[in-house]
Amino acid sequence: MGYNMQQGPGLPPKKSKTGLWIGLGAVAVVVIVALVLVLSGVFSGTNTANGGEGEQAKESKQSAKDIATNYLTAISEGRADDAKKMLGPTSSDTSLMTNEALKDSLTRAPITDISVTEPTGGNSSTVNVTYKVGGEPVNEEYTVNVRGGTISTSTPHLSLYGLKGVDITVNGVTVKEGDKSYDVFPGSYVVASANKYLEIDGESTVVVTKSSSDNIPRFKLKVSQAGIDLFREKVIPEAKACLESKNLDPGCNMALNGTLRDGKTLEDGTITRTQSSENANKLENVVPEPGASVPTIISASNLGSFKVTGICTESTRSGECELLGGFAAVKGMKFPKASLNVAEEDPKVVWEDV
């Protein structure tokens, strides 16, 4: 026999506690999120507004005027590394933007009287700057990236085009390669050859600013007095020895042909070579020039000519004769071009073909 148990109408259903726990958990999550927001957002925002060290505060402290002033001040104090950090990225060669080169510049042309106007613009602001380089006033315009804290305007440049094939120093700093352009700070720059036998032809010290860098004359090389002295020391004794030789081939790459164009023959050992006083003076005072493609190969071709006499034989007759350009090969009637490679430790004279 079975009985069906039924709940009485007066008893309410038993309530579940699951909803209560879910509600309490949601409240806890809200509280935790609120705390995180307060700690990270509100507090940091409050610090920034009150001059704290947040990123926005750092940006607000660096105005365009401040950045430009700090940049020029760093240059004026010889702090090249600090000044470079305030420049925007560049693909140009900056190997001359060193403390050594800058400090050398300041000994001749100090940067003084720095003044920067209030900026115009937004994140990239424009300021006018004035300063003096060695007492000479300079007025320039800088574009400043306020957000990045850098100067966007390109720096002055020093062009060394024309100085290829030889090591060059600028303010005592050796550059890896001449014949190119280098970024520099505004200032005074002394350009010199690292090889003592060569030097800059003309003015070697220039003041460079952004407005003047395009107007600097092209540099070129000439043989220094040390190079002239070395050339004469090496070349003149050899040339004189060749003049004194009685042989058809005296050396100096100026051998005579033993058979003249008119059929006469020259007797070896009877040749006399005589320079006039004018031509002797050319030899004694020769001034070489640097090579066009390889400047360390210095040379001279105007060493003077000379008169050539000797014993000539025609058929059965012999006698002294004088050689003229019309009756003998040109070679042997004058000194050929003499050259010397001053890049070598002990350079030797090379007598080239006429």
Question: What name fits each language-model region?
Answer:
Residues 15, 20-21, 27-30, 34-70, ...:
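Short, low-complexity N-terminal intrinsically disordered segments enriched in polar/charged residues
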Residues 69, 80-81, 85-99, 103-354:
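Short loop/turn and low-complexity linker motifs enriched in small/turn-promoting residues
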Residues 1-20, 24:
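Intrinsically disordered, low-complexity Pro/Gly-rich regions
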Residues 8, 52-56, 147:
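A short, compositionally biased domain-edge/stem linker segment
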